[in-house]
């Protein structure tokens, strides 16, 4: 399936790109956002991150006509360190698209999809060691239930965890789906959606990685530089929203002229998240849960 970048125009416009600026695509994926950034650059430069060597290989071909780019195979939690190694200490904009690419979802070796029978893997970085198979076959029932509840908001977390322990070993996605079908019979939506989300987050440590990346991104931004972040699930969106809020407020002493105090680090550009249009939803059903939040560095 061809990968379609979600909220493409809105997220790129939100960066307020300067032709000679330095920009970062923290989630290269299919290269759609990188392509649009490069189209707007003159003497500027793009640094694009992805921990997936396959994604970088595809993007290398797609973006071969542009010389002002650098690909970095790394988890975006190391965005600051990797850029510093290249002598880059400040940038003018950073975009994060936190969704899986269609290539990853449809890649049978990844095991992200609960619609076909794949190996239980779920690693975004194939060089990483922890897999979903290891989790479901080695974690204790309580730990499994905690993960399903915290990362998937799964109502039947304890029941599903117990069934997994009793059914071990599990090797494929549909073996896990058989369990969720029984545990979540009659519930709205696909029975395995929340469990698969929780396992993917645990395998890739997605929330820890995002927290570290957000703090690094704020340090990297020039004054006037922007963060453009697309999320696809509530935990990530809450984290981004909270980060923006925390860094756009300051506790001023009472009865003091706040004009004499420095501004908070961030100014929120999108008071409410930008959502996909009806037209985009018609053309790309995977965009349905997407939310875009934009903020600008001001101090």
Curated annotation (Swiss-Prot):
GO biological process: rRNA base methylation
Subcellular location: Cytoplasm
Assigned EC number: 2.1.1.199
InterPro entries attached to this UniProt entry: RsmH, SAM-dep_MeTrfase_MraW_recog, SAM-dependent_MTases_sf
Membrane-traversing stretches: none
Binding-site residues for S-adenosyl-L-methionine, renumbered to this chain: 31-33, 50, 76, 97, 104
A Pfam family matched in the record: Methyltransf_5
Protein transport is among the record's keywords: no
GO-annotated cellular components: cytoplasm
GO molecular function: rRNA (cytosine-N4-)-methyltransferase activity
Catalytic activity annotation: cytidine(1402) in 16S rRNA + S-adenosyl-L-methionine = N(4)-methylcytidine(1402) in 16S rRNA + S-adenosyl-L-homocysteine + H(+)
Swiss-Prot/TrEMBL keywords: Cytoplasm, Methyltransferase, rRNA processing, S-adenosyl-L-methionine, Transferase
EC top class named in words: transferase
Family, per entry: Belongs to the methyltransferase superfamily. RsmH family.
Described purpose of this protein according to its UniProt entry: Specifically methylates the N4 position of cytidine in position 1402 (C1402) of 16S rRNA.
Record's protein name: Ribosomal RNA small subunit methyltransferase H 1
């Amino acid at each position: 399936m061809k990968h379609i970048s979600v909220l493409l125009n809105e997220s790129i416009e939100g960066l307020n790109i300067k032709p000679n600026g330095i920009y970062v695509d923290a989630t290269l994926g299919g290269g759609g956002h990188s392509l649009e950034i490069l189209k707007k650059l003159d003497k500027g430069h793009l640094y694009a991150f992805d921990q997936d060597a396959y994604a970088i290989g595809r993007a290398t071909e797609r973006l071969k006509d542009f010389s002002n780019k650098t690909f970095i195979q790394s988890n975006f939690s190391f965005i600051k360190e990797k850029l510093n190694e290249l002598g880059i200490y400040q940038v003018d904009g950073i975009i994060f698209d936190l969704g899986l690419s269609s290539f990853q979802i449809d890649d049978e070796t990844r095991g992200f999809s609960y619609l076909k029978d794949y190996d239980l893997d779920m690693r975004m970085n194939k060089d990483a060691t922890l897999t979903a198979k290891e989790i479901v076959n080695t974690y204790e029932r309580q730990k499994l239930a905690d993960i399903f509840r915290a990362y998937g908001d799964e109502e039947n977390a304890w029941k599903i965890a117990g069934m997994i322990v009793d059914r071990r070993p599990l090797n494929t996605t549909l073996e896990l789906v058989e369990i969720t079908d029984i545990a979540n019979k009659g519930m709205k939506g696909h029975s395995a959606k929340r469990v698969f989300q929780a396992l993917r987050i645990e395998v890739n440590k997605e929330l820890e990685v995002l927290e570290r990346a957000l703090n690094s991104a704020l340090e990297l931004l020039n004054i006037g530089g922007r963060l453009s972040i697309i999320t696809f699930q509530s935990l990530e969106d809450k984290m981004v929203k909270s980060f923006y809020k925390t860094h756009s407020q300051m506790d001023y002493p009472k009865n003091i002229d706040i004009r004499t105090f420095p501004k908070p680090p961030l100014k929120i550009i999108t008071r409410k998240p930008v959502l996909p249009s009806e037209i985009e939803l018609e053309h790309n059903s995977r965009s349905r849960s997407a939310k875009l939040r934009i903020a600008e560095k001001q101090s």
